């Protein structure tokens, strides 16, 4: 279960689209970037709308932060940027006028294939179910805010069932005597 709910499907940002294109200017060159977001999920907390971009993939696609750092595979990041910079008025009208700002919650590739997990033929149902869930785990980049992650996946205590995260409890130290959860990339 999740507090994030779908708020847009096939959202077009382009000239004449649902939102304007993303415009990047450098010296005398201006580039307009257009696209269509498969799904946008939102979660409202204290006047802030947290947005998560979902991109459906039928093949195996995984998110690579090094690709983003090298200027490759920027699609989902550009979508989230477009929503954050241009989406406030749209979502005030669509959801509630009480919104003050949009904050990024994450970007995820979502597998949409029926998976047949690798393994032995004679697997019990529980093992098979666990292998299928693992194959359907999303890939992406998420906020490191524990409250936002818990809003994305209720009951998140260790490794995410569908989210690519793992929570660990940090050991108490002299500076911080209380154990605290830490986020680790999976």
Task: Give the role of each language-model region.
Residues 1-186:
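Structural signature of nuclease core domains in nucleic-acid processing machines
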């Amino acid at each position: 279960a999740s507090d994030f709910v779908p708020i847009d499907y096939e959202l077009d940002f382009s000239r004449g689209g649902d939102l304007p294109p993303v415009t990047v200017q450098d010296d005398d060159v201006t580039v307009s970037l257009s696209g269509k977001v498969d799904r946008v999920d939102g979660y409202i907390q204290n006047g802030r709308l947290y947005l998560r971009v979902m991109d459906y993939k039928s093949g195996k696609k995984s998110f690579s932060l090094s690709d983003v750092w090298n200027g490759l595979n920027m699609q989902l990041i550009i979508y989230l940027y477009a929503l954050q910079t241009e989406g406030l008025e749209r979502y005030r009208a669509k959801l509630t006028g009480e919104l003050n700002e949009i904050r990024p919650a994450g970007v995820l590739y979502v597998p949409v294939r029926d998976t047949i997990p690798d393994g032995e033929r004679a697997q019990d149902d529980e093992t098979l179910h666990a292998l299928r869930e693992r194959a359907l785990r999303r890939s992406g980049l998420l906020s490191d805010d524990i409250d936002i992650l818990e809003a994305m996946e209720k009951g998140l205590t260790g490794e995410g069932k569908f989210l690519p995260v793992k929570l660990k409890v940090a050991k108490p130290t002299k500076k911080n005597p209380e154990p605290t959860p830490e986020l680790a990339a999976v």
